[in-house]
Regions:
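ATPase nucleotide-binding head domains, primarily ABC-like/P-loop NTPase cores
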Residues: 351-576
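Structured, charged N-terminal subsegments at the starts of enzyme catalytic cores
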Residues: 188, 194-278
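Long, charged, glycine-rich C-terminal linkers/tails
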Residues: 179, 325-363
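Conserved amphipathic alpha-helical "coupling/scaffold" segments
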Residues: 1-204
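Charged, amphipathic alpha-helical oligomerization/scaffolding segments
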Residues: 112, 119, 126, 176-178, ...
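Alpha-helical initiation/capping and key positions within long helical/coiled-coil segments
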Residues: 112, 306, 310-313, 450-453
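Low-complexity, highly charged intrinsically disordered N-terminal segments
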Residues: 305-332
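Extended, charged coiled-coil "arm/hinge" scaffolds of SMC/Rad50-like chromosome-maintenance ATPases
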Residues: 270-301, 308, 315
Length: 576
């Protein structure tokens, strides 16, 4: 029976998404952070690719957030699940029963296929037991539990387990076979055949004489061909030099060659004797226990539609959650604060697709990497809503403007990926995409010049973004004169207000922040949107950076004189 794939990442495989560009992931520092989660490049790339897919559907975010919480809190469950799924993956990749079924297969192949099928059932059983024994609450894992139960029921595993058990009881009686060889007057094999299939193993006897001892002593020669049910035997290596020239070996060789000439049993080649002996006896055993072979084939035909389902696709998905859980647990043990994001639920009378309430947030890079700011992480609060749509962020050089701008982008990437966010709380409406307009590398601006490249890139971003996107701008249009940069920047903010997307624009152009009221009035008159722009500042404590942000009018200076004095580069300090 065909089973639809189950996913721990996508409750609805038809949900729409937008993929963040590599540039955006780099601007937010997420590419470097993902490299910290695993030493394997393949796993790093998979995790980054998952995070780059932004699903605006709140149901996807909630689904992931709940699953991650279960994974984070249930260490034993996540370890057990990975072990079970890897066993299933091994069966799927290297097993034989999932390949084309051969009706002419011998008893040994048939039993091997049954064993693999039995192993798969055990894995499904273990998967269900693991989920049933874990304290899970997410719809994703509860759904997986139901999915496993459905696989079990739909494929008739309970009946199959019974059939396999009964077959095992029958086939377990096959312990050995007895071969008879007729000799002519020259002690050459005149015929070879199978006498019986036995329910006992032959056991090694004491040291016996060689072939001449047997024929020299009449009391060791049976008077008839009736087998006395003696299970003692003397094993010999058919390829060993010591026995290669013995009469018994010659008898065996002659018998095999004669049988071969009659289209019967082929001669045993050099190599793995156990495997060759099995192949040597396949046809004879199949004939003598034809009823048992028929029974095994009937069971396999009954369940021929069973295939290892695509549960193995859950392995990288589970790995995604596990790698993040392990890393965040490590950071939590070091004292960093993380919290589960909450998807904004619209009220009965109104909804706010622009809503974001972030409390005590910080840039994840400060926890992951050892930087100048890492030793003094300052948590911040920030809100977006239907009214507060654009922030013009100003403050001193190296005051933390870029750090907080990155942090907001990271919040959405992490939360919509289901991962705990760095901070105390985060309630939000998911974005359709994130766009960054950060300074470009010099080698990318040679053709158009830096300002030309910035303008072209902003136009492309603006055309692709929509009202539910997040736009993060870092010192945009500041590479030219103040007058030119200000003119372009102001028109850009006006256009952003027109579209209504959530935006943080950090800049040294304090005049742009002073003009927010003028731009807001213009937009209100045009009735383009009900969103407004606000001035936000990064506080300074004298010449010391506080990294604390606040919605407030710009302070109108960049603290250049204080910084110059701190580093001794004022005119007076330089020429004294």
């Amino acid at each position: 029976m065909s089973q639809q794939k189950y996913s721990l990442l996508y409750p609805d495989t038809n949900a729409q998404y937008r993929t963040l560009s590599d540039v955006t992931m780099h601007d937010l520092g997420m590419d470097l952070i993902c490299k910290k989660l695993s030493a394997k490049e393949r796993e790093q790339n998979y995790i980054q690719n998952v995070m780059a897919r932004m699903y605006a559907d709140p149901a996807v975010t909630q689904y992931r957030c709940d699953i991650f919480e279960d994974v984070l809190q249930q260490k034993k469950m996540r370890d057990d699940l990975m072990e079970i799924l890897e066993r299933i993956s091994f069966l799927r990749e290297y097993g034989s029963f999932n390949r084309e079924y051969d009706e002419s297969a011998c008893i040994w192949d048939l039993l091997h296929r049954l064993d693999e099928l039995n192993d798969y059932i055990k894995c499904v059983d273990a998967l269900h037991t693991c989920l049933a024994a874990s304290d899970i609450h997410s719809a994703g894992f509860l759904g997986l539990k139901a999915y496993v139960e459905k696989i079990y029921a739909d494929n008739g595993f309970a009946e199959l387990k019974k059939d396999i058990s009964e077959l095992k009881m029958d086939t377990s009686q096959l312990k050995s076979i007895t071969v008879g060889i007729n000799l002519n007057d020259r002690f050459e094999a005149d015929g070879i055949g199978l006498i019986s299939v036995n329910s006992k193993y032959f056991t090694k006897s004491g040291i016996l004489g060689n072939f001449y001892d047997h024929i020299a002593s009449k009391d060791r020669i049976n008077e008839d061909t009736i087998w006395k049910k003696n299970f003692k035997f003397q094993p010999f290596d058919v390829n060993a030099d010591a026995v290669s020239n013995t009469p018994m070996q010659k008898v065996m060789d002659t018998a095999i060659m004669r049988s071969e000439s009659r289209g019967g049993i082929v001669k045993l080649p050099e190599g793995d004797q156990a495997k060759d002996m099995t192949r040597y006896t396949d046809r004879i055993v199949n004939h003598m226990i034809s009823h048992m072979v028929k029974r095994v084939r009937e069971v396999l035909n009954k369940y021929v539609s069973i295939t290892i389902t695509d549960m193995t696709d859950l392995i990288p998905e589970l790995l995604y959650y596990i790698k993040w859980a392990e890393y965040i647990q490590k950071l939590q043990e070091q004292g960093f604060t993380f919290a589960k994001a909450s998807v904004y639920k619209a009220g009965e009378n109104e909804s706010d697709p622009y809503m974001m309430q972030a409390r005590g947030i910080y840039n994840l890079k400060l926890a992951v990497f050892d930087t100048e700011e890492s030793g003094n992480i300052v948590p911040n609060d920030m809100d977006f809503d239907r009214n507060r749509r654009v922030y013009i962020l100003t403050g001193a050089n190296r005051g933390g403007k870029t750090t907080i701008t990155q942090a907001v982008g990271q919040l959405f990437v992490l939360a919509q990926g289901g991962i705990y966010i760095p901070g105390k709380a985060f309630t939000f409406s998911p974005v359709t995409g994130i766009f960054t307009h950060f300074p470009a590398d010099e080698d990318k601006t040679l053709d158009l010049g830096r300002l030309g490249e910035e303008c072209k890139r902003f136009k492309a971003i603006y055309e692709e973004a929509d009202s539910r996107s997040l736009l993060l701008m870092n010192e945009s249009f500041s590479t030219t004169s103040f007058e030119e940069g200000y003119y372009i920047a102001k028109d850009s903010v006006r256009a952003i207000l027109h579209k209504g997307m959530r935006t943080i624009y950090n800049t040294h152009m304090h005049k742009l922040a002073f003009d927010v009221e003028e731009m807001n009035e213009e937009q209100q008159k045009a009735e383009h949107t009900d969103g407004k722009a606000f001035s936000m500042i990064v506080h300074m404590k004298g010449t010391e950076r506080s990294y604390q942000i606040e919605v407030a009018p710009p302070e109108g200076k960049s603290y250049a004189s204080e910084i110059a004095q701190k580093y001794g580069v004022t005119y007076e300090m330089l020429v004294k």
